[in-house]
């Protein structure tokens, strides 16, 4: 019976190792990385706040593109690598970049709005804007330069980390909590201490990506779907999880 037990422990340990792959990245590439993104083509994007740079690598660690700006910026997602939205609160503008990280579109908010705290690009036409100066949530068609809707939205803007709008619900991640609102700014749900870096949607699932774990919103709470306790940063694409740990990049397949 004891031998049978040890066999299963060995099998579990072997399977755990086979699920992990050390990707071919130089440790210098991974130092001082503040954010990590992975698209569904196996490409990895590393953001460094030190020089406001985003660098794209293939799965072998070969550089495919590099973007450097003069002000800090926030990449929303690389789920569509042909149109990567990037918002700079300092510059008050949203830029879209192509698969080579070349700029293909710029939307400047200074002339039309007050102070935009956060942006969510719903698609290639519509944006959701949180205007801190007017305390409003704005639905904006930037292709037509037209405001579609504007809602009073008197919430705490100061600590906002990320924003997502889906099916008439507004998901707000802050340094303090995670909250869900309707368009009247009525709070539907609040979960304190989310400790997340960004919100991500996969089909109907809302995910919170933290420093070392990824959680899924499950009714009124979070369910952990991936965790790497010693990780510096984690992220995922539709097929795998990515972990930076001790200046190495690992890939985990479920």
Give residue ranges: language-model regions.
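Start-of-domain marker
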Residues: 20-83
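Repeated scaffold domains used in trafficking and secretory/extracellular systems
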Residues: 30-37, 71-78, 113-122, 157-167, ...
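Short beta-strand elements that form the blades of beta-propeller/WD-repeat-like
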Residues: 35-48, 82-88, 125-131, 165-173, ...
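Hydrophobic, well-structured mid-protein blocks that either form specific transmembrane helices
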Residues: 110-163
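Intrinsically disordered, low-complexity segments enriched in Gly and acidic/Ser/Thr residues
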Residues: 177-227
